[in-house]
């Protein structure tokens, strides 16, 4: 379909394209003209090669300006800094649907944003050899007026395509666009990033790398407090990102030079637990950023757990297989301790579980605070102190924990109950 527009054209253009049932789309601004042969020439190129996503003509100015509109050849590196494809270009309707059409948030240069959406993950652009577009220029035309909206355009593009700009420019698109790569190199010296991505999730490297830029604007908030959890859909997979708050000044120095960040420890410890066949959501990666040699924000990324419940649910609702669930949690705790791992934030919200046909699945989260070394009987039983429950629940936990570690179950129960009472008493005094 050929779509013409003027004035409120962006709105009408979106509506017209959404209603079209044709295979190909060609937007043409009402002031401009195309040659009678352009569409047939362009369709030939699209049908000849399925990798071709966009076919555009050579163009000539008419109106207040004359001569050929000499646009540079297409490349992703150049597309990251400037648009070299006019709105008048033929593309498949399926591409428009795939990227969600023209962005409604951006109020200028929507064609540039659209071409980035279509082409950033690959695809060819063909420019026909002959002049087949006649582009009208008037004093005060939209292209000239759009220049005043440059800060807005830059902000929206960075928000929507941070991964693309990171890959092509090494960071954000800057207001002086041609200097973007150099500015980003200089900034990276003073604001270095540290990151790692698990080999199985290398396709998410760009996402992990730009978390300091995109975290506040994307995703769904799961929890917000001292730290923040957000869920993202990346490449069809649900992932959870934990953003750790910026530490106080002394710790900013310590984390920058001497100590692993919480995000990095979470990533490393999750991989360690999974090596020991202890359940934990698959770690994807981490990213941290510093500023002027002071540690800043850090982010840990993992797959979203498929476990629908936490230990906190056990005292609050009936579970038909409650004893099996408690025994599975006790066994998981015992395996942790037998491997010399003591979780120092072993609370009800950090133990997840799911009831499956093959048995109860347990996963441990919030892993940045671990202690490594031999875990004694007393230390192991004290580790249950923050888990609420009834006497019957503690009896099951103690019995299974004792069996798994070869301890006396009566002694374990005694120590677990003592630790729980001490913790409850301390909490009451603090509150």
Regions found by a protein language model. Give the residues of each.
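C-lobe/activation-segment region of protein kinase-like
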Residues: 363-425
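Acidic donor-binding loop at a coil-to-helix junction in glycosyltransferase catalytic cores
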Residues: 107-114
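Conserved ATP-binding subdomain of kinase catalytic cores across diverse folds
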Residues: 210-308, 338
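Short aromatic/hydrophobic "clamp" motif used to bind/position activated sugar donors
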Residues: 25
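Conserved donor NDP-sugar-binding/catalytic core segment of glycosyltransferases
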Residues: 37-68
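Catalytic core of nucleotide-sugar-dependent glycosyltransferases
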Residues: 131, 135-138, 144-172
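Single conserved hydrophobic/aromatic residue that forms the stacking wall/gate
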Residues: 1-12
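Catalytic beta-strand/loop signature of glycosyltransferases that borders the donor
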Residues: 58, 126-132
